[in-house]
Amino acid sequence: MKRLKLILRRTYLTSTGVNCSFEISRLSRIGKINEARKFFDSLQFKAIGSWNSIVSGYFSNGLPKEARQLFDEMSERNVVSWNGLVSGYIKNRMIVEARNVFELMPERNVVSWTAMVKGYMQEGMVGEAESLFWRMPERNEVSWTVMFGGLIDDGRIDKARKLYDMMPVKDVVASTNMIGGLCREGRVDEARLIFDEMRERNVVTWTTMITGYRQNNRVDVARKLFEVMPEKTEVSWTSMLLGYTLSGRIEDAEEFFEVMPMKPVIACNAMIVGFGEVGEISKARRVFDLMEDRDNATWRGMIKAYERKGFELEALDLFAQMQKQGVRPSFPSLISILSVCATLASLQYGRQVHAHLVRCQFDDDVYVASVLMTMYVKCGELVKAKLVFDRFSSKDIIMWNSIISGYASHGLGEEALKIFHEMPSSGTMPNKVTLIAILTACSYAGKLEEGLEIFESMESKFCVTPTVEHYSCTVDMLGRAGQVDKAMELIESMTIKPDATVWGALLGACKTHSRLDLAEVAAKKLFENEPDNAGTYVLLSSINASRSKWGDVAVVRKNMRTNNVSKFPGCSWIEVGKKVHMFTRGGIKNHPEQAMILMMLEKTDGLLREAGYSPDCSHVLHDVDEEEKVDSLSRHSERLAVAYGLLKLPEGVPIRVMKNLRVCGDCHAAIKLISKVTEREIILRDANRFHHFNNGECSCRDYW
């Protein structure tokens, strides 16, 4: 009877101990370590399992100091207790402490050794892991797998292969890992040999082999293997689909996608990205719209597709929809939207994205800083761009180039030169891109002497050989300064063949300074280089029109029709209340506020006439009467956008207008005068640069 009571008590204590250990572990797993400790302290009888559980709980909750204190208080320890201490330190990335405990252990088993090997592998200390592995008194299947898997993860495929061949038991997990490692190294045929030799394969093995073929651009072989796969899962279907999308075979991908029995989010995302890369925006949007569930990558892929194709308005629209649905934009999404904001000059959205980046602490990255600076520069907010630049004590070359390019596009040559001369003292030497930016700045600001000095010292001072882009900037600089003959001499002295940008710069100078003789030479060279470029025809027509050579204008226009060359349509846009309004020449018929815009145009036209404005009809090349030409000029897209800005934006707020082409001379003169008669600041970004109009003056000083 006494013996029976003893057995029952031991059974009770053991079962109670197991239950207590379970409760401590449960509380620890859900982060309630303090409750676990209270429960532990309340135990009248603390079994060794309970001690091990609470020590492990402290480690799991990132409290190694408290775990060690409890371990030291244990009156009795077994090998499980010591293993728990080693594993706990390893979980907390404290490999030195783990090794010290390992050396102090009164006894070790295969779990102790394997834990240390795994710990060293986790820390990237492969040499120590190998040394310990080969010292192990005995190894089990887990030991081999840990060492083998660590070598594969570290990219040591040759060593992994040798170890694989030595393994006493090659289970399906080990073989699958070996196949994956070999495929990542491009050794796909070697991987296939292992695959074919396997007696047992699971769905992961098949998918790994298919993925290996896909990663090595052998999509057709992957498809053959996929077709004979005994059991296909969502992952295997998706892997095969990715093979088509990542290799650019979007038609095959589309066909495969249609027959997929399940269409997981990752597969739909792949199709959106694939369609986006080949410009099939409507198909990408159809996939997007049909999705029941979307993740961050879905929105990012669709926004990127719009951005890549130049559908900036749709990208902004989608970003707004994303916010309404409470989806937090990812870093790549924010960068894509910043690029869109820069293109559209959408300052309000740009500021909003900047705030997102600050909240997510992404704004301390120099790459992000460069993108932000570009956005602010293109929105006409140069002061904000400079503030971003000044935040960084250590700047990379891209940041320097961004701010110099920004000053250049705004015609602020002095500021650009100041920044340029600060570069060497900061430890950053100008590169090819920097020199293009500073030469452009000198050209736009009329800094001929400084610009020529930089150009002539490029090789000796900065070790940069002039490229065709540098020559183009210098030709433009000379041409803007009226030194058209010297510009031609520079072209003739070039050691590299001048391209269309060089001849285009000369042709632009010929227009500004009425050099019809050299204009014909430049135009001929441009027609040879870019026979389909409508800009050359238009510029030559404009030069002839300015000299009233209407017969020559007609010849140029006829040649355009003969060669099927059409002029790229001009458009301008303005952001009002987080909405971008787009205008084309004369194109306000579909605008909901058409009548009010026309009234504002009539009002400004009247003010201009009173101020003595005389339209320059040479900028209208159509064969129509003078009255129609005058009316056509006032309907240029930039004039429509300015009128809308006057109509909608309150006084004191700058009117920011963007245009995809170079502003014509008449619109430039008209907007200058509009800024005076309306007492409004107008900022116009055209294809070449920024124009800041204020009180009848322009920042370009009519030098553009």
Swiss-Prot record:
Gene Ontology MF term list: RNA binding; zinc ion binding
PPR repeats: 16-46, 47-81, 82-108, 109-143, 144-170, 171-205, 206-232, 233-267, 268-294, 295-329, 330-364, 365-395, 396-430, 431-465, 467-497
Region (Type E(+) motif): 578-609
Subcellular location: Mitochondrion
Keyword Methyltransferase: no
Official protein name in the record: Pentatricopeptide repeat-containing protein At1g56690, mitochondrial
Keyword Cell cycle attributed: no
Domain of life (superkingdom): Eukaryota
Organism of this sequence: Arabidopsis thaliana
